[in-house]
Amino acid sequence: MMNDNNERKPLRTIKGRVISNKMQKTVTVLVERQIKHALYGKYIKRSTKIHAHDADDLCNEGDVVLMTEVAPISKTKNWRVVEIVARSD
């Protein structure tokens, strides 16, 4: 059944640290998360590298950025940098 009012799901946003800005209009962002081990209950760090679109080339290595999910921009990019939360030192 279709919903009459055009409600959209809220876009996913994630925070990560820029580890590379060598590409044009693209940054590589490291996103870390913690998962709980199924048997032992210990929390383990896991990380994912994501390519994100940075239209104005404002991000530098070490910056903490907020990204949102968008329609695919290229083969590997479907995230866009929304905001630079913290600049690198």
Curated annotation (Swiss-Prot):
Q: Does the keyword Transit peptide apply?
A: no
Q: Which gene encodes it?
A: rpsQ
- State the Pfam families in the record: Ribosomal_S17 (PF00366)
- How is this protein organized at the quaternary level? Part of the 30S ribosomal subunit.
Function, as annotated: One of the primary rRNA binding proteins, it binds specifically to the 5'-end of 16S ribosomal RNA.
State any single GO MF term: rRNA binding
TM stretches of this protein: none
Chain segments annotated as coiled-coil in the UniProt record? none
Specify the protein name: Small ribosomal subunit protein uS17
Gene Ontology BP, a term: translation
Q: Kindly give the NCBIfam families that the UniProt entry links to this protein.
A: PRK05610.1, uS17_bact
Q: CDD domains, from UniProt?
A: Ribosomal_uS17 (cd00364)
Q: Report keywords, A-Z.
A: Ribonucleoprotein, Ribosomal protein, RNA-binding, rRNA-binding
Instruction: Give the similarity note.
Output: Belongs to the universal ribosomal protein uS17 family.
The record's listing under InterPro entries reads: NA-bd_OB-fold, Ribosomal_uS17, Ribosomal_uS17_bact/chlr
Any one cellular component term from GO for this entry? Answer: cytosolic small ribosomal subunit
Classify the source by domain of life.
Bacteria
